[in-house]
Amino acid sequence: VSMRILVTGGNGQLGNELQRILREGRSEIGPIPDAYAGAEIVAADVDELDVTDADAVMAFVAQGGFDLVVNGAAMTNVDGCETAEDAAFRVNAEAPGNLARAAEAVGAKLVQVSTDYVFPGTEPEPRVEDDPTGPVSAYGRTKLAGEERSLAACSRCFVVRTAWLYGYVGKNFVKTMMRLGADRDEVTVVDDQLGNPTSANDLAHEILKIAATENYGVYHCTNEGTCSWADFAEAVMEGAGLDCAVIRCTSEEYAAMNPASAKRPAYSSLRNKRLEDTVGNEMRPWRDALSAYLNNLPEMEG
């Protein structure tokens, strides 16, 4: 019997990659587990399913007969969450709880996608899964609450924290830099926030590997290597062949230019320790993943 998979936020950066990888049976990294052969995927966005409506979620999951639920639905605008924490809490915390209860009721597995922003980012050492959390923003607080609710309500739950995600669809930092780089001679980017740029293709690959096991709990899943946003921007300009200089600034300078911006962790690099210890860490070095992305992007945008 082929597996039935529900992906919420199904047409977002991650949802899109999950759909394609499941169709093709492989990612840019390589083949996915045989358990997914012939899998049926239901990609639900807000039009199909309001994840904040507990009753609707329970009914949708029960009727769908799903084996696996991947929650890619989130309010990810970090600055926007700061001024709308109630709305962010509904989507980032209550909705995962709804999905977790629904998955538990039908015996399905749940993957709750989370973020490096659950950490304070005060220590310049990559975080492992059981390091103490301490979010400094509304986005981080609401996502941490979503992790807690998911793990509490579903016994077959994986929490997968990622960071600085970019995919072939939708808006992301890489596409923004390419757009600005084509128009401008220079762009100003912060140089004192460090983390891991992550390809949605790599993340989707590892999520499918993890979810084929019963090693439940928290995982970190980012591309390998730590850089600043300015380093990331420079790599994009170089890789896309754009003649645009990256001017480096501090978070303080950025905040002065953008007063509504949320506080962000200074150092939120993650170490994929649990992956290393279980299914194996196949996440590519971030520059390799970015090169592949830039090569594939014209064809993907077709």
Kindly give the residue locations of the regions a language model identified.
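Rossmann-fold cofactor-recognition segment
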Residues: 40-55
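NAD(P)H-binding glycine-rich loop region in Rossmannoid oxidoreductase-like domains
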Residues: 51-91, 102
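NAD(P)-dependent short-chain dehydrogenase/reductase
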Residues: 148-195, 200-202, 208
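Glycine-rich Rossmann NAD(P)(H)-binding loop
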Residues: 189-194, 219-226, 278
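Mid/C-terminal beta-alpha module of Rossmann-like enzyme folds, strongest
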Residues: 206, 213-260, 294, 301-302
